[in-house]
Amino acid sequence: MSEFIAENRGADAITRPNWSAVFSVAFCVACLIIVEFLPVSLLTPMAQDLGISEGVAGQSVTVTAFVAMFASLFITQTIQATDRRNVVILFAVLLTLSCLLVSFANSFSLLLIGRACLGLALGGFWAMSASLTMRLVPPRTVPKALSVIFGAVSIALVIAAPLGSFLGELIGWRNVFNAAAVMGVLCIFWIIKSLPSLPGEPSHQKQNTFRLLQRPGVMAGMIAIFMSFAGQFAFFTYIRPVYMNLAGFSVDGLTLVLLSFGIASFIGTSLSSFILKRSVKLALAGAPLILAVSALVLTLWGSDKIVATGVAIIWGLTFALVPVGWSTWITRSLADQAEKAGSIQVAVIQLANTCGAAIGGYALDNIGLTSPLMFSGTLMLLTALLVTAKVKMKKS
């Protein structure tokens, strides 16, 4: 109880939201996401320039996710009492350094080192995002602030691949990463200007991160997070083969579907704060239930292009509630240990993304075209049931 009081005394004193700081965090998160996925659209020229296969070059994305998973788990144990403002500045420096190392890479090993630096920044920043947010705004404004941050994520996910592809043709892949390094420098200056001092956890309050899982409802919550994100990646990773073969979309048609998905996701994120103010638990249970029904509809009637497009829009709109909702759950139910809870959450999501994509791919190759949808829908239904039965939610 003393830890709760100590960590929230500063938060309780906040009467006016620091929106400049919130937007600086959102901008930094967006830059991290864009740089994370830049290689997806630049894979071919990167591979040709470095004299490696595209499959090997693709490991530049894998190593980032792998390092991010471990960074998220151990970052709070490492930084302890360090002022979080300085830690965030360090992450922005790592983002900039990563872009420069990749830009000047003349070997695959240097490329991986650069991408590993990004993984450290990505995992650490994501682990701290919820706890940072709740220290920048009053408690009643936390859902809105989180929706700003995840709105930036939605925009980044929509523009990362096409922006990288367009600029890569225009100025070359190395200069794309140089431009990203400039964004990193902007992050550094904006954070220095807007983010206040945020003292870390005193050493005498140090607590093992994994002890949080012993609290009532926390393990159930993390399992629900795992299943919902695994279900998402089992579906979304293979949306191209499913939509092109099941519904008969052309490449141009699929591009429009993905654009619609991205716009719907942004709208869903923007509306999430209004929904979460009414009931976080209802949102966390209702969203996966809607997604489970959507997966069933796509499995049964996905050959109709109108139905398939509608499902993509509903999916983007609905899943947008999930990351904002779970971050809100952490800020309310685990407010005294939000940073450590965020560490576990990020690691669980990274693992879920990997497992969901792997199992979905195996199902697609060995069972059938609609099998990733059935797997995804099953996970979403189980998530809804688990949240309803086991996940605890404290009122704000």
UniProtKB/Swiss-Prot annotation:
Gene Ontology CC terms: plasma membrane
Compartment annotation: Cell inner membrane
Gene3D superfamilies: MFS general substrate transporter like domains
Positions in the Periplasmic compartment: 43-54, 107, 169-175, 237-255, 303-305, 365-366
Reaction catalysed by this enzyme: inosine(in) + H(+)(out) = inosine(out) + H(+)(in); guanosine(in) + H(+)(out) = guanosine(out) + H(+)(in)
Organism in which the protein naturally occurs: Shigella sonnei (strain Ss046)
Gene Ontology terms for molecular function: antiporter activity; purine nucleoside transmembrane transporter activity
Membrane topology: Multi-pass membrane protein
Function: Involved in the efflux of purine ribonucleosides, such as inosine and guanosine.
Cytoplasmic side: 1-21, 76-85, 129-147, 197-215, 277-281, 327-343, 388-396
Record's keyword terms, sorted: Antiport, Cell inner membrane, Cell membrane, Membrane, Transmembrane, Transmembrane helix, Transport
PROSITE patterns: MFS
NCBIfam families, per the entry: PRK10213.1
Presence of keyword Cell membrane: yes
Family membership: Belongs to the major facilitator superfamily. DHA1 family. NepI (TC 2.A.1.2.26) subfamily.
Membrane-traversing stretches: 22-42, 55-75, 86-106, 108-128, 148-168, 176-196, 216-236, 256-276, 282-302, 306-326, 344-364, 367-387
Record-given protein name: Purine ribonucleoside efflux pump NepI
Superkingdom of the source species: Bacteria
Signal peptide positions on this chain: none
Database matches in Pfam families: MFS_1
